[in-house]
Amino acid sequence: MNLKTTLGLLAGRSSHFVLSRLGRGSTLPGKVALQFDKDILQSLAKNYEIVVVTGTNGKTLTTALTVGILKEVYGQVLTNPSGANMITGIATTFLTAKSSKTGKNIAVLEIDEASLSRICDYIQPSLFVITNIFRDQMDRFGEIYTTYNMILDAIRKVPTATVLLNGDSPLFYKPTIPNPIEYFGFDLEKGPAQLAHYNTEGILCPDCQGILKYEHNTYANLGAYICEGCGCKRPDLDYRLTKLVELTNNRSRFVIDGQEYGIQIGGLYNIYNALAAVAIARFLGADSQLIKQGFDKSRAVFGRQETFHIGDKECTLVLIKNPVGATQAIEMIKLAPYPFSLSVLLNANYADGIDTSWIWDADFEQITDMDIPEINAGGVRHSEIARRLRVTGYPAEKITETSNLEQVLKTIENQDCKHAYILATYTAMLEFRELLASRQIVRKEMN
């Protein structure tokens, strides 16, 4: 180990020691270490078997579920649970790692799509997992094919790594990479081929550019797609979900390759994350019993259907950041069998995406079919989200708006409903959690 690496380790770990006692610093120690040695990540990661999880939606939950399973196998798994998924956050994760008690060093990391190529200059994953790619933060990522090419460029740097893809996404059909490829997906009963919803993106045939149809469409552009023009269809699946046993707003049960599993988290979109976690675990040699044990011990993920109480109100915090994710979150809360208040917190910082026009493509119209006595529109762009909610036809007099998140919290505390959902963009979620943590309603970190 050379001098600059040694200094980087010392500076990074010292800053982590100080910041952790102040309750801060998920990325700063890595930033400090990288200033001493820009290649320090290569030294830190060289003795690890690494699984990388990337994609638009579902990175954090897929990673958390996978870690829960692999802890049943290895006892200790390195990960970045708070979602610090750019190079400074990844460097911090390795800087603060504890020595493995089993002698097997394994890391499961969620990595930002735009940061992946740079990070792969320094790490050698054995497995890449891509959950999906949807339109997200257009000012940062551009359109979906730009994002996909960013990821493929990173994967090509590690040609020996296996790539695990969501086979239900037409975008992932026959990727131009030298790596071994495996697919996971929903293999449910098929019906007559039909067009996807008119507002769905990414439904052009990857071979002839015709419009795809679906024999089964789970949501957005995902499902058993087929092109009636050239015969192109979804590839054979290596990991198959064959039955939905139960689906509610806070849990689900399903069958994957003959084994029934369950997670204590709601929504169809999150079952894809569980399916990806099962596929990763099986790829790494875990059996179904260990997978079940891991799922049974899984708990709330940072800001992703995280539950807590404000006074006597049971509250659930849900991250939203793009049209598909927001629509699926709305589909999930629609399954609630009780009335609830709704808060929608919209920020427009860099990490949220500065362009907030995506809210007009999310299906907020569904709220008019739900038992929602009142809505709080909050965050920096509270007036924009309030306008979007009024356009749905929901009564304008039942919508309050404020940029003050303390006021949102106070409103929830004083409401008549015993249940509340808070849908929040990324930085709004962080700010709201910070407020909750300051009142000891939630833990600041979820390690």
Curated annotation (Swiss-Prot):
Residue numbers binding Zn(2+): C205, C208, C227, C230
Q: Pathway membership of this protein? A: Cell wall biogenesis; peptidoglycan biosynthesis
What class does this enzyme belong to in the EC scheme? ligase
The impact of changing D139A is: Slight decrease in activity
Q: Which EC number applies?
A: 6.3.5.13
Annotated catalysed reactions: beta-D-GlcNAc-(1->4)-Mur2Ac(oyl-L-Ala-gamma-D-Glu-L-Lys-D-Ala-D-Ala)-di-trans,octa-cis-undecaprenyl diphosphate + L-glutamine + ATP + H2O = beta-D-GlcNAc-(1->4)-Mur2Ac(oyl-L-Ala-D-isoglutaminyl-L-Lys-D-Ala-D-Ala)-di-trans,octa-cis-undecaprenyl diphosphate + L-glutamate + ADP + phosphate + H(+); beta-D-GlcNAc-(1->4)-Mur2Ac(oyl-L-Ala-gamma-D-Glu-L-Lys-D-Ala-D-Ala)-di-trans,octa-cis-undecaprenyl diphosphate + ATP = beta-D-GlcNAc-(1->4)-Mur2Ac(oyl-L-Ala-gamma-D-O-P-Glu-L-Lys-D-Ala-D-Ala)-di-trans,octa-cis-undecaprenyl diphosphate + ADP; beta-D-GlcNAc-(1->4)-Mur2Ac(oyl-L-Ala-gamma-D-O-P-Glu-L-Lys-D-Ala-D-Ala)-di-trans,octa-cis-undecaprenyl diphosphate + NH4(+) = beta-D-GlcNAc-(1->4)-Mur2Ac(oyl-L-Ala-D-isoglutaminyl-L-Lys-D-Ala-D-Ala)-di-trans,octa-cis-undecaprenyl diphosphate + phosphate + H(+)
Q: Does the keyword section mention tRNA processing? A: no
Coiled-coil ranges per UniProt: none
Swapping D355A leads to an effect described as:
Decrease in activity
Q: Cite a single Pfam family from the UniProt record.
A: MurT_C
Q: What parts of the sequence cross the membrane?
A: none
GO term, biological process aspect, one: cell wall organization
The GO molecular function terms of this record are: acid-amino acid ligase activity; ATP binding; carbon-nitrogen ligase activity on lipid II; zinc ion binding
What is the role of this chain? The lipid II isoglutaminyl synthase complex catalyzes the formation of alpha-D-isoglutamine in the cell wall lipid II stem peptide. The MurT subunit catalyzes the ATP-dependent amidation of D-glutamate residue of lipid II, converting it to an isoglutamine residue.
The annotated subunit structure for this chain is: Forms a heterodimer with GatD.
Query: What family is this?
Result: Belongs to the MurCDEF family. MurT subfamily.
Q: Under what name is this protein listed?
A: Lipid II isoglutaminyl synthase (glutamine-hydrolyzing) subunit MurT
Query: In the record, what lineage is assigned to the organism producing the protein?
Result: Bacteria, Bacillati, Bacillota, Bacilli, Lactobacillales
Gene it is expressed from = murT
